[in-house]
Amino acid sequence: MKSTEKLKWNKFDATWMLNLFGTAVGAGVLFLPINAGMGGFWPLVLMAIIVGPMTYFAHRGLAYFVLSSKNPGSDITEVVEEHFGKTAGKLITLLYFFAIFPILLIYGNGITNTVDSFIVNQLGMASPNRVILSFVLIAVLISVMLFNEKVMLKITEWLVYPLVLILFVLSIYLIPEWNSAVLYEFPTVGGFLTTLWLTIPVLVFSFNHSPAISSFTCSQFREYKTFDGAERHISHTEKGASTILLFFVMFFVFSCVLTLTPEELVAAKEQNISILSFLANKFDNPYISYFGPLVAFLAITSSFFGHYMGAREGLEGLYLKMKGEAVNRKKLNYATALFFLLTLWGVAIINPSILGLIESLGGPIIAMILFIMPMYAIRKIPAMKRYSGRFSNVFVTIMGLIAISAVVYGLL
């Protein structure tokens, strides 16, 4: 196939596109209109223009980094060691694991809280035993990951279709309620730039699907057998994932922001409730609030699978680096599954409040791995030189540094 020939969508690429979408869209999508829209409408417009290319180029760069190994099919933990040496490889793998693992803990906790809340508030039943409920939910999620890749991708596909449909229908449903108040609120230049700076990380992490990129890249190579074939299909699939993320998520965000006044967005933030709960109260329409737990359930479950892949790679990569010898991968898979089951179950029972802080500490690490590491590799690693000289490299580096500086500022 000539490199200039336009790729057609096939079932394999489309399924992975939906998986990457599912990995990115977690329960945070229900708070995104509040967090992203509080700074006003016009900064949001500029961010919507920036975030699409930012998502595509950054994730494509990370995928090309994984693909650049001289040993085809190597995952990210093996590639960092190959390119940066054993010590740096161990350190990056450790950071990679500890950036993703807290998100997995939050999802184990979040799915328990979501189902428990639905049983109590929507079904009007008594709260089930948390120990049993959390074990069943987490065990089911992890058991899916023990099946082969095709089963996991198929289940993710079933979850993402209704998720996309609900977000789209809600966005359309709100159109008659749009008001023009936010269009006439013009921030000062300083206020505009500050809002842009502080809100970029909100969108970056809402569109982040880097935990699934390594598994996605390895899967693409297994499917297409050659470097050129995998490279083209990676770019094609990633472009599709970034496009549907931009359209469906940002349409939902804009529809919510245009429905509420700036004061109402601030009130929603102060009440610390999801956008759907706030809209249900505003319009006195309980049916909207019914979608909240459903969207949260679909988003957490589909995102869980992508983050599990990343956390598993990190943990198994650490073990293999420490062990330094060949091991039975199937046994290792079951051992890591047991580790995740016990840790996620324990955290879901305790329901600690410190998880959010731990997750926020992982933010700069994820941004470094996603934005800076592949761009650094393009300059320093011979296998990545083929990607040098592109304007997109400068764009990703600058946006990555802006995102990291804003995340670090937010932690201070």
From Swiss-Prot:
The protein, known as: Serine transporter SdaC
Transmembrane segments: 31-51, 91-111, 131-151, 155-175, 186-206, 240-260, 286-306, 338-358, 361-381, 391-411
Function noted in UniProt: Mediates the import of L-serine into the cell. Is energized by proton cotransport.
Short name of one Pfam family: Trp_Tyr_perm
GO molecular function terms attached to this record: amino acid transmembrane transporter activity; symporter activity; transmembrane transporter activity
UniProt superkingdom: Bacteria
Parts forming coiled coils: none
Keyword line: Amino-acid transport, Cell inner membrane, Cell membrane, Membrane, Symport, Transmembrane, Transmembrane helix, Transport
CC terms in the record's Gene Ontology section: plasma membrane
Cell inner membrane recorded as keyword: yes
Gene name linked to the record: sdaC
